[in-house]
Amino acid sequence: GTGG
C-alpha cells in the first residue's frame, strides 16, 4: 500500500 501507499501512505504519506
Swiss-Prot record:
This is T cell receptor beta diversity 1. It is found in: Cell membrane. Keywords: Adaptive immunity, Cell membrane, Immunity, Membrane, Receptor, T cell receptor. Its main location: membrane. It comes from Homo sapiens (Human). The gene is TRBD1. GO terms for cellular component: T cell receptor complex. D region of the variable domain of T cell receptor (TR) beta chain that participates in the antigen recognition. Alpha-beta T cell receptors are antigen specific receptors which are essential to the immune response and are present on the cell surface of T lymphocytes. Recognize peptide-major histocompatibility (MH) (pMH) complexes that are displayed by antigen presenting cells (APC), a prerequisite for efficient T cell adaptive immunity against pathogens. One of its GO terms (biological process) is adaptive immune response. Alpha-beta TR is a heterodimer composed of an alpha and beta chain; disulfide-linked. The alpha-beta TR is associated with the transmembrane signaling CD3 coreceptor proteins to form the TR-CD3 (TcR or TCR). The assembly of alpha-beta TR heterodimers with CD3 occurs in the endoplasmic reticulum where a single alpha-beta TR heterodimer associates with one CD3D-CD3E heterodimer, one CD3G-CD3E heterodimer and one CD247 homodimer forming a stable octameric structure. CD3D-CD3E and CD3G-CD3E heterodimers preferentially associate with TR alpha and TR beta chains, respectively. It comes from the Eukaryota.
